[in-house]
Every structure is written in C-alpha cells, then in structure tokens.
Amino acid sequence: MEGPAFSKPLKDKINPWGPLIILGILIRAGVSVQHDSPHQVFNVTWRVTNLMTGQTANATSLLGTMTDAFPKLYFDLCDLIGDDWDETGLGCRTPGGRKRARTFDFYVCPGHTVPTGCGGPREGYCGKWGCETTGQAYWKPSSSWDLISLKRGNTPRNQGPCYDSSVVSSGIQGATPGGRCNPLVLEFTDAGKKASWDGPKVWGLRLYRSTGIDPVTRFSLTRQVLNIGPRLPIGPNPVITGQLPPSRPVQIRLPRPPQPPPPGAASIVPETAPPSQQPGTGDRLLNLVDGAYQALNLTSPDKTQECWLCLVAGPPYYEGVAVLGTYSNHTSAPANCSVASQHKLTLSEVTGQGLCVGAVPKTHQALCNTTQKTSDGSYYLAAPAGTIWACNTGLTPCLSTTVLNLTTDYCVLVELWPKVTYHSPDYVYTQFEPGARFRREPVSLTLALLLGGLTMGGIAAGVGTGTTALVATQQFQQLQAAVHNDLKEVEKSITNLEKSLTSLSEVALQNRRGLDLLFLKEGGLCAALKEECCFYADHTGLVRDSMAKLRERLNQRQKLFESGQGWFEGLFNRSPWFTTLISTIMGPLIVLLLILLFGPCILNRLVQFVKDRISVVQALVLTQQYHQLKPIEYEP
C-alpha cells in the first residue's frame, strides 16, 4: 500500500508553489516584526460590550504604556442585562425590575478559557459549580488565573426604587439618570495585566436564585490601541531630487500695503505666495555647523577667534552626553509623550556622568553620577527641555515607572549633540605645509565635549538672569532646530531608499514566480536547474519600522521644543518678515515713548530755569539804577 507513494522521483514531490509560500511567510514575518519600546505611550481604549444586545456598556480611553494602562471600569448591571432577560420581570425595563436585580447575587465565568464541563455560551460558561472565577455572592467566588474581577460598587442608601430622573419628577428621592442603581466595578488582576489582549475576551454572568434557573447574559472586553497608520507615497521617487546645493541667502522684503483698485476696475484676486522650498543637503549640513558655531561662540568666545569646525562624515553622526537634571512627575502621560510609536532608536556613544534611573548594570554605572530608584505607583517621568532619556530599550522623552518597577530597564538623562569636531588653525595649516615632517596624532575635540551640559548647567541654571540667558537659550535652540531638521531629512532619505529596495525585490519576486510557472512540469526553477533553492529574506520591514520610530521621535522632540518656547519667542516665529519689521520700528517707537513720558517734566524744568534766570537779571538791573542810603545817626 505504501510502496508506490515512495517509488516516485523526489522532484515529483516538490510543490511548485512551495518556494513562493515559504517566501511569503518570510516576508510577512519580516514586516510584522515589532520592537516596542516599553515606555512608549499609546492611546488605549477599553470597551465592555453586551453580547446579547450588542450595546456598549463602557468605553474608557486613557494614555499609557502597554504595561500600566489597566484602569478600573465602571458600568451598571442593567447595561449587561438589558430590558428583558430569560424570565418576565427580571429585566431592567421597569424601576421594579431594576430594584429586583439589585437583590440578587451574581457570579461570572470566563469564556476565553473554558474548563472541562463548564459548557458554552448557552450556559454562560457556568455549566457546573466551580467554573465561576469572580462575582458578588455569599461564597465569594475568586480565582488566581482569571484576568478580571467584577464586584458591585457603592450604592447610595437613599437610592430609592431605581426611578429614572429623566422620566419622573425631580422631587422623587433617589432617582438617577437612566435609573442606574446597580453599579459594577471591573478591575484587572495581575494575570490580566500580563495577558495578551490582541482579541476580545468573553465572560458569562448569571444571577443566583435559590429556586429556578439562574438567568444568563454574556459580555466581552476588548482593548483597542490607536496608532499612526502607514504613510503612502505619491509621485516620483524623491531620493535624488532632495540632494540640493546650498541655497543663497534671500533678502527679506517688507510687505507693501495693498493699493486700492481704481474705480470701475475689476477686482483682482492676489496670487498666493509659493510654498517655501525644503532645505537641501548642503543647507542642512551648513545649518548644523552654523548652529554649533553659534552655541560655541556664546559659551567660549576665545575658542572661536580662529578655528575649524568639521562635520564627521562617518557614523555615528550623533552622540549623547549624560547630564544631571530635574525631571517632572506626571500622573498622566504628558502631551509630548502621546505620539504613538512602534520601534527603538538607540545611541551608539554616550559619554559623561549624569542622572540614572532604574537598575543600572555594572557595565554602565560609569555613566551615572546619581542613581535614583523609582517608588511604587504609576506615573511618568518627563525629561527636561533639551534632553531625552536614553534607555536600554531605546530613546524616549518620558518614562513609565510601572515598566521600570516590573522590569530591569534603566535609563540615563542625556543631551543629543551632532558629531562636530573642533580643530585649532595650527592643525589645519600643518596639513598643507610642504615637506615630510612627523606629525602627532591630533586630539579631536567634539562639540559634545566642549558644550556638554549646556542645557542643564548653563542655560537652565541661568534662566531669568537677564539678556545673556535669553540669548543663550536662542543659540542653543537654533542648534536643536538644525539637529531636528537634519534627522528628519535623513529619515526621509533612508525611507525612500527602503522603498526603492522593496520595489526592486517585488520585481525580482515576480520574475521568480514566472520562471516557476514556466518550469512547473519539472518541479519549479530550482529543480530544472538542479541547484539549491535560495530564498530572499527581506529585512526592509525592520528598516521601515526603525524609520517610523525615528519619525515619531522627531515629532515628539518637535512638540517638546515648541512647548518649551515662551509666547515672546513664538511671536517671532510666526512670520519671516515680522522680526525685521519689529527691529526696524522698535527704535523710533522707543524714542517716541521716552519723549512722551519724560518730555513734559523736562519742559517744565526748562521753563522754571528760564524764569529763575530772568528774575535774577531783573534784580541786577534794579540794583544798578538805585543805591542804598546810609543810615543817619542822631545825637541825643
């Protein structure tokens, strides 16, 4: 019976679609690989649905990580029962039915994991005693493995007969909106916080009655995580078109006031200004170097008298400097942490000593000047402006203490600096001097070594001390903006290259499939060539994930950068000609204001002075025309 099955040649048993099926599995696996940062904040929505009626009993949304976004859910028992139940009079259609439901105990049985003998949906997964895992009954049902616990909430003593306040008069004591007098509280257990909520979980609920059949209802609990969808390309491949030379500085012209049209002329719609052109590669590189120079010139003017600033052409292009700073605690996720992201971005070089949080291993304790342990509780640690948390799971602007307490993660507070080296003029001159002279290995000073700690030690410590602090903040923010723009353009370039590679691989796969169809009788292309089959493993999914990670981190840094600006600084960023206009008219306005303030006082002083001098002159004239008589002495 089995002989003929093994008597055929081996190539006849090769499924011609096998390579394509395996290839599709490999590609799908490569694309679906996700490297979630445990500190990433998502918009999580929990939804409790009555499966008997399809209505939503509760929908709660909050911002949090995948580890600590497990709130308490409040809803009413009548949201799960409905107007009518198995028997007449047990529903929540009337106030009496709602009040009667409050007198019964209830128990809940899980439908996501049904033990043997517990039945199915018809029995509410409570086919026998012992299947219940939670509820509110005299025997106190409980479980160590179920995902939730469901108990009754606090019912006011003056609740009354569960009247609906929207139907009856307001004078009836205890009436509530909708007649909701059976509050329930759903909490997640430790097992529920560790479980996978990729799909809905189902439970059955039954009212306990001493006689008769216990009525059944079913509900589901679903978690929905909102995330930013994929970005679809439209138009030609912009990989090469983005490589633009440095643009010439454009002279800013003040806008002219609109001229009124002549009488009888047709109205002309003004043309809109063309959109601003994106900076090219040369502009971005020059902005990085210019921002580095501005920050260095402010902090160390002696070093910028004559120097060379060189942008490193090889990776790593950025480095981190550990700093000490004061983070802020938030009970809920801040706005700059709410952008959804999927993947990790790390730093290959971190120097200095700064603030560390979590369980730092011995190999990285040299980066820590101060190590703080997080206390129990669920809150978020937001990095100060200009800094970011460098964790072993990736870069993030916020930390979740729940993740730190449950894992062995650690984070260091760092500043992000471009890899710009500083050289003295002597070093550059020696590179062009003639003659074979022995040269020492130069000591490369990077921008991180020269300006490390500027955010926390220089600018942040001097905030509010005057004009110097304001100028320092502006120079540092200029460098931050240049770094942000450069990272954004690098992300776009790599994303475009990844798309080109994916398109090329799709063409190759189509050719491979066509050849397999042509050699279908021979068992496929590999069998016809009598060679080992090679399968293409596409790792562009990981590239796409990391680029999405970088894009979202850039958005977070942009929001943090904008939130750190005051109203006065943001006023100058609204329009390109606003700064020039203000600087032009500010001087005359200040002079006019000073004249209006101090002019009357000065004029009064001047008039009084003139009057005094005139009085003195008049007195001198009178004394010259008359002389004083000598007194005559009379003899007695």
From Swiss-Prot:
GO biological process: fusion of virus membrane with host plasma membrane; symbiont entry into host cell; virion attachment to host cell
Cytoplasmic side: 603-636
Entry keyword Cytoplasm: no
Pfam families: TLV_coat
Marked site: Cleavage: R440, E441, L620, V621
Extracellular compartment residues: 33-581
Biological role stated in the UniProt entry: The surface protein (SU) attaches the virus to the host cell by binding to its receptor. This interaction triggers the refolding of the transmembrane protein (TM) and is thought to activate its fusogenic potential by unmasking its fusion peptide. Fusion occurs at the host cell plasma membrane.
Known partners and oligomeric status: The mature envelope protein (Env) consists of a trimer of SU-TM heterodimers attached by a labile interchain disulfide bond.
Protein name stated in the entry: Envelope glycoprotein
Organism whose genome encodes this protein: Mink cell focus-forming murine leukemia virus
Lineage: Viruses, Riboviria, Pararnavirae, Artverviricota, Revtraviricetes
